[in-house]
Design a protein with these regions (language model features):
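Solvent-exposed N-terminal domain segments of exported/luminal and surface proteins
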Residues: 3-124
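A recognition module on extended beta-rich or small alphabeta surfaces enriched in W/G with H and D/E
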Residues: 81-84, 88, 200-235
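Extended, loop-rich substrate-binding clefts of extracytoplasmic carbohydrate-active enzymes
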Residues: 94-165
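Beta-strand secondary-structure signal
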Residues: 139-141, 157-159, 170-172, 185, ...
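Acidic (Asp/Glu-rich), glycine- and aromatic
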Residues: 156, 167-199
Length: 267
């Protein structure tokens, strides 16, 4: 296992098991059979999924069929999530700590990878196995083996890479078993209030606005500006739904899709 990162290192990647004794041991990788109930896998991981972090933001990728990419924004540059694990208190935020800023729900959030059924994004639901791993202090991988999509099985490997001097997270998707006509998607959510968003050339989806990340605490409102940009060679089309601005994606001849995720507080 790699050594814990420090603020000077500029990136960190964290995967922990949830522990009833609240030790939450760090692990290198985990994989669940496809038959595992989503809530069991989701709750088995502390923070509900792997975390990847640069000095400006952090992402966590949920360990379930949505594989939602949630966003944590910093008030001050540095690494925080080894301590906060996405669970910031109002008092800590008032003192300058970062916090999760999005209400995930059923949206694509910010750069989640999904299928597309011609109308909307679809989860990676029927799989033979699902896993996450920390490759090093700057890389997290997510794997779905044997995803049943459009009547055939696909193997998916998602790689998320952070950089010490950038707020951008690079995403590389490798697909094996894709057939002609298979279309996938990513994009950004529409925020609950004051939402502004859409698409810019050549291949970018963006949005900004406000929402209450925790439905149990509607009085705590956060603001976020989201941007996902894909390789123009991977862009098949764009689409807008009630929840999302979507980039519709096709893999290249080698099975790759590439895009970037970034977020900030609106100016």
């Amino acid at each position: 296992m790699s050594m814990p990162a420090t603020a000077a290192d500029g990136t960190d990647a964290i995967l922990r098991l949830r522990d009833e004794r609240k030790k939450h041991p760090e692990i290198i990788s985990v994989e669940f059979p496809g038959s595992t109930k989503w809530r069991e896998a989701y709750d088995a991981i502390y923070s509900h999924g792997a975390i990847i972090e640069n000095p400006y933001l952090a992402l966590r990728i949920y360990m379930n069929e949505s594989q939602a990419v949630d966003v944590y924004l910093k008030q001050n540059p540095g690494l925080e999530c080894r301590n906060t694990a996405f669970y910031s208190t109002p008092e800590a935020v008032a003192a300058g700590q970062g916090t999760a800023v999005l209400k995930v729900g059923k949206s694509i959030v910010a750069g989640s990878f999904r299928g597309f059924n011609g109308r909307e994004a679809v989860d990676i639901a029927d799989v033979e196995s699902r896993g996450q791993a920390v490759t090093n202090d700057s890389t997290v991988t997510v794997t779905d083996r044997g995803w049943l999509y459009n009547g055939h099985r696909i193997d998916v490997c998602e790689r998320y890479t952070a950089h010490a001097n950038s707020a951008v997270i690079d995403v590389e998707i490798l697909l094996r078993g894709v057939k002609e006509g298979d279309i996938f998607c990513t994009g950004v959510q529409k925020l609950e209030t004051d939402n502004r968003g859409g698409f810019t050339l050549p291949a970018t989806a963006y949005s900004s606005g406000k929402n209450a990340p925790d439905g149990k605490k509607p009085e705590i409102v956060e603001a976020g500006a989201l941007c996902v940009e894909c390789d123009p060679a991977n862009l098949a089309d764009t689409g807008e739904t009630d929840l999302n601005y979507l980039l519709l994606l096709k893999p290249d001849k080698d099975g790759y899709i590439r895009y970037t995720i970034t977020a900030s507080r609106p100016q």
